[in-house]
Amino acid sequence: MASISSLNQIPCKTLQITSQYSKPTSKISTLPISSTNFPSKTELHRSISVKEFTNPKPKFTAQATNYDKEDEWGPEVEQIRPGGVAVVEEEPPKEPSEIELLKKQLADSLYGTNRGLSASSETRAEIVELITQLESKNPNPAPTEALTLLNGKWILAYTSFSGLFPLLSRGNLPLVRVEEISQTIDSESFTVQNSVVFAGPLATTSISTNAKFEVRSPKRVQIKFEEGIIGTPQLTDSIVLPENVEFLGQKIDLSPFKGLITSVQDTASSVAKSISSQPPIKFPITNNNAQSWLLTTYLDDELRISRGDAGSVFVLIKEGSPLLKP
């Protein structure tokens, strides 16, 4: 049936043949006989033959496919033109939006600033300008109504809060650095945990505060700190010291200590396992002044900009975001 269906789709023209002899009429033609030319049988046959060979026949291809047995006519046959090539048009790459470009520029400007501590005045001005532009294009103008976006761990990438600068400057102490400052938010329990991780050649430890927050406006939350936590030092069983450290502008050679470190390597390994198994130290925060408010001025799924007391600004990036990669 597929062949019949295909044949029915071939266009055909009906050839009308005028008979050489016309039926007699009651009226006599006024035209002279010499002015009327009737084609002969030979000319008529020649005309038919020429048209038959000069008009090319359409080509078609029938392809057998599985079809429903209930369909008595079978599937429709797709006509394929000779020499046709199927071309799949690929969509052009999506151009980044203005917000994405601004976020990328901001991340590039933050690189090497040590969370703002080492930023020059020119870099600070550039960062402030980019922050202002992003705040004007905030995709979530009421962040407290989109609390699920606040969920998760946020890494501090930049701040102008001078109260954190003494903490950040501890990274300049020999063998000690601030590895990470983060804020973890749980919108279901309305809790916030601020954490600072310190790292050294012998161990890593953390200091955290747990707090509750309340929504006060579409952009503002009130935070009350309730508990402090000193994490158990996680000692490393493989101690690696640098060749030298810089302290107060002078380089101190640490090579004499390498022999001592090697001799106590096995002891440190056993101590690390015993200390790391101890629970962290927790203490309540009873000071009534241990509270603050936070205003979120920009929020999406990977970037958050907040402003705190005295106009200080915080730029935080969601853990796992490509913006954290230099």
Curated annotation (Swiss-Prot):
Induction record: By high illumination, water stress and abscisic acid.
Swiss-Prot/TrEMBL keywords: Chloroplast, Membrane, Plastid, Thylakoid, Transit peptide
GO annotation (BP), single: response to water deprivation
Xref: InterPro entries: PAP, PAP/fibrillin_dom
Targeting presequence: 1-63
Location of the protein in the cell: Plastid, Chloroplast thylakoid membrane
Disulfide-bond pairs as recorded: none
Coiled coil (residue ranges): none
Keyword Lyase: no
Domain of life of the native organism: Eukaryota
Tissue: Expressed in leaves.
Subunit record text: Associates with the major light-harvesting antenna complex polypeptides of the PSII oxygen-evolving complex.
Entry-linked PANTHER family: PLASTID-LIPID-ASSOCIATED PROTEIN 4, CHLOROPLASTIC-RELATED
Family assignment from sequence similarity: Belongs to the LIPC family.
Role according to the record: Required for normal plant growth. May be both photoprotective and play an ancillary role in photosynthesis. May structurally stabilize thylakoids during osmotic and oxidative stress.
Protein name in the entry: Light-induced protein, chloroplastic
